[in-house]
């Protein structure tokens, strides 16, 4: 396939969770591919660092400090991104971790995780789809699921439930938006070394990483750039016949088949 299929010159991408980790890697890579990127995150300092990385490499980035669980904030930012030309792609990456057993989980824990990890993605998809449909142009939406949708993990009820909801959202959107030439796919990463995973107990993190390395045929954990390349593929014309899929870059761990 010609490399031009991955050329995003003249296109506009909106990325949530762009202040660090997978979101930042996506923003940097899509900008390297030629896209103008609009970066959204609650962490304004991290956003500024992402924009600096993109600018220093010759790319174009715009920052939108916001809370993805607030629909009005996302709506305003996405409509602004579309007003600068058109919106071609969305990467809804923003998410949080929470650990508690089922019996320990409080209402506020579940509400907070669902607000960010599910509603935040739902809102971004809804508002992006609306402007894409209004423009009458093809588009690509990529949501961020997780390997947690394939295997139960003690202590991850809120996180796993939210990510499972994202999978069904993705499939439903793919069915509904296909007639508008808008593709919708999800990425379900395995263990990826990011600031979000680093914030958890260091000993537990080391144990989890060691376990993933043993389980992976590739004998390593993933890096944010591994996921960013998957997102680039799904955002580009190289995947023009791909929609409704859950792509699992996980080093061969937790193969559902």
Predicted regions and their residues:
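Substrate-binding pocket helix/loop in short-chain dehydrogenase/reductase
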Residues: 101-102, 106-114, 212
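C-terminal helical subdomain
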Residues: 186, 210-238, 242, 251
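Active-site helix of classical SDR
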Residues: 125, 162, 170
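Short C-terminal tail/terminal secondary-structure segment
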Residues: 2-4, 151, 232, 243-257
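Residue(s) in the substrate-gating loop at a strand-loop-helix junction
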Residues: 146
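Alpha-helical segment proximal to the catalytic Tyr-Lys
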Residues: 130, 175-179, 240
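A glycine/serine/threonine-rich, flexible loop-to-helix segment
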Residues: 4, 179, 191-215, 256-257
């Amino acid at each position: 396939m010609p490399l031009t299929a991955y050329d995003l010159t003249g296109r506009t991408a909106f990325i949530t969770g762009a202040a660090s980790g997978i979101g930042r890697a996506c923003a940097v890579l899509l900008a390297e591919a030629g896209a103008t990127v609009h970066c959204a995150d609650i962490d304004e300092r991290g956003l500024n660092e992402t924009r600096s990385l993109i600018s220093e490499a010759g790319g174009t980035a715009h920052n939108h400090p916001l809370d993805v669980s607030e629909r009005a904030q996302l709506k305003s930012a996405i409509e602004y991104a579309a007003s600068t030309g058109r919106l071609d792609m969305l990467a809804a990456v923003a998410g949080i971790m929470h650990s508690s057993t089922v019996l320990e989980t409080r209402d506020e824990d579940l509400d907070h995780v669902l607000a960010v990890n599910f509603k935040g993605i739902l809102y971004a998809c809804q508002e992006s789809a609306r402007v894409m449909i209004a423009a009458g142009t093809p588009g690509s939406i990529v949501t961020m699921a997780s390997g947690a949708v394939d295997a139960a993990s003690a202590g991850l009820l809120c996180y796993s439930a939210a990510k499972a909801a994202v999978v069904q959202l993705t499939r439903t959107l793919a069915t509904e938006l296909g007639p508008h030439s808008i593709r919708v796919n999800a990425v379900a990463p395995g263990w990826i070394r990011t600031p979000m995973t680093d914030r958890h107990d260091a000993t537990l993190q080391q144990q989890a990483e060691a376990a993933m390395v043993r389980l992976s045929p590739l004998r390593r954990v993933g890096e944010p750039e591994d996921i960013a390349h998957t997102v680039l593929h799904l955002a580009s014309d190289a995947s023009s016949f791909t929609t409704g899929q859950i792509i699992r870059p996980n080093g061969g761990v937790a193969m559902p088949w």
